[in-house]
Amino acid sequence: IPPFLHEWHQQLPPQHQNYIHLNGIIPNQKLIKVYAKSKICLCSSRYEGSHIASAEALCAGASVVGPRLTPQLNCLQWYVSHDSGTLSPDDSPESLSGALLEEIRAWDSGKRNPEEISRYWCSLLHAENSCKRIIAAYEAAQGGKTGL
């Protein structure tokens, strides 16, 4: 973890320090527990293909917060489409912070269900399920069909 992040964390009010944990690099085998415990995956990136970390978080039952208008990262609109996250209306730090607060309120008011988030996204994103959908699409195309 860069020293400036530790300094930033130490300057936070004590009540906020308890809610923000700087974990550094986390081994793959521990990621699911971290995602589930954190509840929210904040995606501040603008330039990633499908943001694998967000997909992993969804499968672990966490929700996603990110910028709305990002053509290079348009998967986020899909990731929040099933009561599983919030997008910021504008691409700015203030707007992203507001979306994060909105998502925290959604969890606090019971609008997010980690089991439902995980069940839904695992059914779509796990490798076996994805392969079945690709094969079905291929077979449908071979037969002249247009749907799955």
Predicted regions and their residues:
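A charged, aromatic-enriched C-terminal amphipathic alpha-helix characteristic of glycosyltransferases
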Residues: 108-143, 147
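Short alpha-helical donor nucleotide-sugar binding micro-motif in glycosyltransferases
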Residues: 33-38
